[in-house]
Amino acid sequence: MITIGIYLAERGLIPDVLLRLFIKRFSLSRLVEANNEEKKMSVIDGLKTGPIAENTIDANEQHYEVPADYFKAVLGPKLKYSCCWFDDESVSLGEAEIKMMESYLERAKIEDGQMILDLGCGWGSLSLFLAERFPNSAIYSVSNSNDQIEHIKNIAKEKNLENLHPEVQDVNSLNLNQQFDRVVSIEMFEHMRNYEALLQKVKHLLKPDGLLFIHIFCHKETAYLYEESGEKDWMTRNFFRGGIMPSHDIFSHFSEFEVKKTWKVNGTQYTRTLNEWLKIHDHSKQKIMSIFQNHYENPSIHFYRWRLFYIACSEFFSINNGKEWFVSHYLLSPKQ
């Protein structure tokens, strides 16, 4: 049944209202499976062994090596590929991108003149924002995607941002010679599988009084892995192989850092973000199909697959009025 539903959805043959109803019910059923304290602790224990990131090649192919032109066509003007902040109905996607990034400045206590590392920088929305806002700061941007780093370099060159230093690095072998006042990581830890090793690396990159700021999506209580075990694991198979759904309290289980402060961002903020991307995706169908024709054997399936991704995630974050799955911000300081 699930296989037939996915087959039809990836061809645009199921009305959105039915898709959303099915996805909401399916998400709630998966929550019942995952909501187990023993399983959660097993997942957290597993985040203390093995490679920092798994399936990095698959993850890049699924998300980050999708043509840059696609993200330029679908995301907001800053290309922020993560949750944005709509503080009222009139806020545009572009304004919401900036509002969320401004919240990082306040919460991470970022100031001009600091050395800042954007770890898992995506398409450079935050790195470019910081480099322009803080001309006396040095901003280092790290991603394992060649396309992303080339995009950031091109924009930095256009804007003459000499204080921005983007480079391709695999987090498993992360090697930087600098020490930083702030390390900022936006929606990267969800792709990591050894938090303990990664936090140890970050601790060595920070100055003694440095701070780590993290933005993740999470569940209010439980943690679980995205693993492909059957037909129902469409999200893992197509978008999130090697990923994890963290719990809100995830960072309290690791000894390298002290959690100084946490903030919850209601999941409906991500629902709105995803629905805005979906609107643009639909409005730009002709352009996107042209981009996909040069990249995929079956561009139509990929067009509808991305639609399904946005719809699925938007419903997911709306459950329980955005209080079941949501976004969390953390300010952490290294334990001495």
Report residues per predicted region.
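N-terminal auxiliary segments of SAM/dcSAM-dependent transferases
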Residues: 2-71
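Class I SAM-dependent transferase core
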Residues: 44-55, 59-110
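Conserved class I S-adenosyl-L-methionine
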Residues: 113-122
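Conserved SAM-binding loop of SAM-dependent methyltransferases across substrates and taxa
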Residues: 123-135
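Conserved SAM-binding strand-loop segment of SAM-dependent methyltransferases
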Residues: 158-172
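A short acidic, Gly/Pro-enriched loop at the edge of an enzyme's catalytic core
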Residues: 172-183
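A short glycine-rich, Lys/Arg-flanked "PGG" loop and its adjoining helix->strand segment in the class I
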Residues: 196-211
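Substrate-binding/catalytic lobe of Class I Rossmann-like enzymes that use SAM or dcSAM, i.e.
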Residues: 218, 224-324, 334-336
